[in-house]
């Protein structure tokens, strides 16, 4: 076992926590391609209620995920995660037993109240060493992407056989599996990761809201997920109108998602190697906008929809993969957790607002107008992102620090920031820890440890 590889405990943590994440997100995503079709038998069905039901989890999750993360720091990660999964399972059962779209919406809101994302990520950080933490997070990130693709396959198949109720019952079962994994398979944490790396602080978030570059990214992820839920309010029904039966929708979704991933990877590699990240970012927002505009024109053609969705998901995948890394690079060294907390809340809020927008436009106008509205959202994002600044590549590390006084903390911060490769240094006396944003090519860890009095 080398220092550059995951140890057995980290591998176990990565796989088990990624599984919990995937089970939960699979349950949330499975509804997107089927509710607009199979929800028509529910009492009170209307496009605006479909949009509300699809996005309701986003509102409650946006509100509760940061408090749940803070609570996990006080009473323990496993308790909060298991409690959240129980609430998620209860919400799934409420929705499964519902005979009206309003009660389905209540169930979806309850699902979102099981807001365990922050606690899960903090737990993953607790169970991994500083230098291995990005790998563990990457495994979790991949599991979320895979769960979306699998949901596009599984949702239509399950709903075709057992209806909307079947989707929610399966979601409840997955939540129970998640509880088993957390209680039986996830290792117990011996240490806690630095708070600045993992947990959001409301006071820090208030300060970061004013940061122009972070504000652009928060607005961006909100608008990105707004477009996603907007189009899925009407897309499944439109595919049926165009002649693609409901249980065959995955014939379109899976090839599109697979090809979109294959096309996105070289774009990302070239953008990073050639240092053209901003150009690729702006280009992806433009591609997303154009794809939705084209969709509004080709809405009566399955082939046209497939081509537009391919372009949309190439852009979506690139932006979804790029923005968290940009947030980490831009965020102040000791406030990464708060920056990511604000970013995640914006993402969930976007899912809610997208459902509302898609439902309202579908109910008051036409399907074409829904896609045109999504294109307008993309245009607004393009304007917001135009002056975005991409910072130099960096990463954040933290060091335990022995501090005698506030003056000592300020002196140490000045000494650390003067070291080669240190872009920013923040010393937090309350935590006895120093957070460094560094250029890995120039930074000498032993030199920093020596200045901090660790060797």
Model-assigned labels for residue ranges:
Residues 2-10, 187-218:
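Juxtamembrane intracellular "pre-TM" segments in multi-pass secondary transporters
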Residues 58-66, 148-149, 257-265, 351-352:
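Residue-level signature of mid-helix packing/kink "hotspots" within the transmembrane helices
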Residues 63-99:
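Conserved MFS/SLC helix-loop-helix module at the cytosolic interface between two early adjacent transmembrane helices
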Residues 65-76, 263-277:
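Helix-to-loop junctions at the C-terminal end of transmembrane segments
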Residues 107-144:
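Cytoplasmic helix-loop-helix junction between adjacent transmembrane helices
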Residues 140-183:
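Helix-loop-helix hairpin linking two adjacent transmembrane segments in secondary transporters
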Residues 173-192, 381-389:
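C-terminal membrane-cytosol helix-exit motif in multi-pass small-molecule transporters
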């Amino acid at each position: 076992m080398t220092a550059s590889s995951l140890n057995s405990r980290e591998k176990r943590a990565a796989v088990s926590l990624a599984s919990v994440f995937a089970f939960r997100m699979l349950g949330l995503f499975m509804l997107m391609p089927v509710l607009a079709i199979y929800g028509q038998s529910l009492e009170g069905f209307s496009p605006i209620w479909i949009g509300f039901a699809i996005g309701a989890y986003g509102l409650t999750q946006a509100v509760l995920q940061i408090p749940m993360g803070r609570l996990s720091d006080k009473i323990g990660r496993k308790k909060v995660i298991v409690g959240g999964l129980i609430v998620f399972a209860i919400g799934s059962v409420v929705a499964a037993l519902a005979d009206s779209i309003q009660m389905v919406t209540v169930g979806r809101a309850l699902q979102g109240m099981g807001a365990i994302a922050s606690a899960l990520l903090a737990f993953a950080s607790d169970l991994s060493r500083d230098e291995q933490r990005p790998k563990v997070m990457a495994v979790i990130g991949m599991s979320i992407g895979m769960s979306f693709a699998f949901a596009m396959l599984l949702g239509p198949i399950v709903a075709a056989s057992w209806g909307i109720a079947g989707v929610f019952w399966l979601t409840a079962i997955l939540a129970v599996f998640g509880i088993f994994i957390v209680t039986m398979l996830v290792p117990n944490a011996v240490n806690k990761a630095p708070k600045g790396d993992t947990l959001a602080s409301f006071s820090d978030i208030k300060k970061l809201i004013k940061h122009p570059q972070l504000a652009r990214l928060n607005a961006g992820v909100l608008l990105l997920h707004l477009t996603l839920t907007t189009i899925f309010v009407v897309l499944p029904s439109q595919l049926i109108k165009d002649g693609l039966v409901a249980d065959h929708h995955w014939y379109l979704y899976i090839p599109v998602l697979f090809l979109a991933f294959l096309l996105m990877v070289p774009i990302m590699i070239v953008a990073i190697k050639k240092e053209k990240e901003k150009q690729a970012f702006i280009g992806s927002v433009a591609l997303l906008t154009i794809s939705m505009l084209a969709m509004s024109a080709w809405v009566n053609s399955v082939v046209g929809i497939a081509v537009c969705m391919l372009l949309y998901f190439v852009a979506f995948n690139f932006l979804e993969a790029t923005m968290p890394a940009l947030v980490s690079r831009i965020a102040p060294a000791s406030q990464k957790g708060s920056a990511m907390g604000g970013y995640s809340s914006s993402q969930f809020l976007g899912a809610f607002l997208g459902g509302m927008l898609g439902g309202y436009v579908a109910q008051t106008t036409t399907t074409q107008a829904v896609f045109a509205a999504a294109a307008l959202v993309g245009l607004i994002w393009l304007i917001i992102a135009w002056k975005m600044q991409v910072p130099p590549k960096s990463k954040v590390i933290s060091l335990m620090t022995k501090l005698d006084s506030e003056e000592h903390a300020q002196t140490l911060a000045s000494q650390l920031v003067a070291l080669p490769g240190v872009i920013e240094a923040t010393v937090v006396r309350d935590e006895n820890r120093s957070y460094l944003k560094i250029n890995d090519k120039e930074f000498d860890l032993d030199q920093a440890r020596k200045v901090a009095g660790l060797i």
